[in-house]
Amino acid sequence: MADKIMAVTGHRPEKVGGYSDEASKRLTTFAEEMLKFYKPEAVITGMALGWDQAVAQACINLKIPFLAYCPCKEQDRKWFPESREMYRYLIPFAKEVFYAVPGTYPGAWCMQVRNEMMVDDSDYLAALYDGSPGGTANCVAYAQQMGKEIKQLWDPWQWFLANRC
């Protein structure tokens, strides 16, 4: 799978351990292990809280280029100050930053536009997805519709939590 572009989608902190520094470090460590295994040439991340940002941090740590595909310029407008600070720390490390829609937040639909851009511009999708409805499910469904290979990471994540933490 080396020399391919990986897009990532996954759950927010509520479903992957919470907002603590410890939870964030655990998720980033898992992201690093996943990146070492798949060895992508570059990664596309939607920069959402949780999995997306953990993957961005793991890319920085491993010196893997990543592309930030943001739904709009105010993606972080409703986040807690600590979350906004992390987002603003990560963005300058992106090789490129793309916005699904220009300007300010037009509504939740722009996140699906972003998801479709990520899937369209990647070779495969790595999904930290537990099967529940929501934005991650929508991204996975679009990737399936487009015939993209999907690496399902939920079971490896559960194993990691049980055996490595």
Question: Where are the predicted features?
Answer:
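Acidic/glycine-enriched connector segments
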Residues: 1-165
